[in-house]
Amino acid sequence: DLDFPMDDEAQRISTGSEGLDNILGGGLDPNRMYLYEGSPGSGKTTIALQFLLEGVRRGERVLYVTLSETKAELELVAKRHGWSLDGIDVFELVSPDPELELTVLHPAEMELSETTQQVFDRVSETNPTRVIFDSLSEMRLLAQSPLRYRRQVLALKHFFTTRRCTVILLDDQTSEMGDLQLHSISHGVVLLEQLAIDY
């Protein structure tokens, strides 16, 4: 849960969503790791793109690491909102060919630690100030065990504490309470829900 003292507002960075910035008391504390959690279709990708586009608008380097969606799929989401991905470095760890997707991410061919190392290498090369990691659900599948998954998430956290960048991890909400271990290592958790509107 996010509880920010109000005098720190000037130091916070915008999420790219005025409404969310207002809820968060001005935005996010910089150089921290956050979790955006919600069911599929709740808007995680959209709100993640808003965060990066705000960075682009401010002249920052930004990185979208994707294990779940191709660049073409992200471009389609952006296009629906009238946005462009220009200025966003999209690092795909998913095959653009759906026929190959399962083999590309199969643990026998691409170990989880190798995937994590590729992310570290890309961040070190590009030195972004804003990073989206999409998504932890795929990392869970790659890990094949809760212990391996937790180790890799902790490795991500330890790596990013040495960088000057704000990181948002995207995750599907797997239960009503969410992933409590993941909540405990995140600086803040934003829960996204789909609401049915009565007409």
Set out the residue ranges of the language-model regions.
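Phosphate-binding/switch region of NTP-binding enzymes
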Residues: 166-199
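Loop/turn-to-beta-strand initiation segments
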Residues: 61, 127-130, 161-170
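Phosphate-binding/switch loop-helix module in NTP-utilizing enzymes
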Residues: 99-161
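Conserved P-loop NTPase
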Residues: 1-6, 11, 125-126, 194-199
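Scaffold/interface architecture of coatomer-like assemblies
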Residues: 25, 33, 40, 191, ...
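Conserved P-loop
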Residues: 33, 39-100
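Conserved catalytic network of the ASCE P-loop NTPase/AAA+ motor domain
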Residues: 26-29, 54-58, 81-85, 121-125, ...
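Pre-Walker A adenine-sensing motif
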Residues: 16-27
